[in-house]
């Protein structure tokens, strides 16, 4: 058997090894930054740190040992970023499934994805405060479980035939585009950038209500709300947008995401940010 102990990349490495060696994997997440401990996919990277491809397995880890008394003493930035990656699951899966009649298990996953969003709005801010104080509160536990368990269950249910279609979207496409800049890849966390990408997704989708909710939530906990927060300038935008629209993450979308849509979304985000300083 193989024990996958650590964060997302360590866990994904051990899971991939388990798949290749045909050994059962048991996971022990030490941070709450993603759902790697419970899901049946590993994210593979190139040697320069850029995204390569997802590597799917037949089964998730046999068991995940989640010890909140350990996780509470890890750096808060990991759960902070994990929150952004988790609420993305709701928006990306529901938009991907819009106007479709998916098979039951996919529909179940899309329906469950709401639990990747609403509990974090309720508990996320206090959970971060409690972690800073070393307190394993109800809010902290609910946030940890949303990040590690709920998101993984949704991920497994909405992944059909080892294709990522319902399992990703514009938020992740923006993340992969941003991390093509070495200083961003090295200086920012996955969920932090995905959370920023969700703001753009909501603007492209003309979902003003949820945009305002997510913007205010991001602002309240320090997740990115503008270009400066992710260290890009107006001069970088063309490259970011070009890369974003080339990502397969937006292939399964109810409409084509164009460069013009993204340009307008970036403009709207900056204008909204300037008016809410």
Q: Which positions does each model-derived feature cover?
A:
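C-terminal charged capping/lid subdomain of soluble metabolic enzymes
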Residues: 207-277
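Generic secondary-structure signature for well-ordered alpha-helical cores
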Residues: 49, 69-73, 88-96, 118-129, ...
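Active-site segments that bind and position negatively charged phosphate/pyrophosphate groups
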Residues: 103-216
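N-terminal small/polar loop signature for handling phosphorylated ligands or for N-terminal nucleophile
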Residues: 1-26, 126-140
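Structural motif
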Residues: 1-3, 24-26, 62-64, 192-195
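A glycine/threonine-rich phosphate-anchoring loop and its flanking beta-alpha core
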Residues: 19-113
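Short, basic, helix/turn surface patches
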Residues: 1-7, 52-60, 254-263
């Amino acid at each position: 058997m193989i024990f996958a102990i650590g964060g997302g990349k360590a866990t994904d490495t051990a899971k991939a090894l388990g798949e290749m060696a045909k050994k059962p994997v048991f996971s022990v997440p030490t941070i709450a930054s993603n759902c790697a401990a419970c899901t049946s996919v590993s994210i593979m990277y190139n040697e320069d740190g850029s995204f390569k491809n997802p590597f799917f397995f037949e089964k998730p880890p046999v068991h995940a040992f989640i010890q909140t008394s350990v996780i509470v003493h890890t750096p808060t930035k990991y759960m902070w970023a994990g929150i952004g990656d988790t609420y993305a699951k709701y928006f990306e899966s529901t938009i991907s499934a819009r106007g479709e009649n998916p098979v039951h298990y996919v529909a179940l996953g899309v329906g469950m994805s709401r639990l990747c969003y609403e509990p974090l709005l309720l508990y996320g801010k206090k959970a971060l405060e409690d972690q800073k104080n070393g307190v394993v509160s109800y809010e902290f536990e609910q946030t940890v479980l949303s990040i590690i368990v709920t998101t993984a269950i949704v991920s497994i249910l909405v992944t059909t035939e080892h294709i990522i279609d319902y399992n990703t979207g514009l938020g992740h496409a923006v993340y992969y585009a941003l991390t093509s800049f070495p200083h961003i890849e090295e200086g920012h966390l996955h969920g932090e950038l995905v959370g920023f990408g969700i703001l753009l997704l909501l603007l492209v989708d003309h979902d003003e209500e949820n945009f305002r909710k997510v913007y205010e939530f991001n602002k309240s906990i320090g997740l990115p709300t503008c270009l400066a927060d992710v260290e890009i300038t107006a001069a970088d935008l063309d490259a970011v947008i070009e890369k974003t629209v080339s990502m397969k993450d937006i292939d399964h979308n109810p409409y084509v995401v164009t460069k013009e849509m993204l340009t307008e979304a970036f403009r709207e985000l900056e204008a909204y940010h300037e008016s809410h300083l």
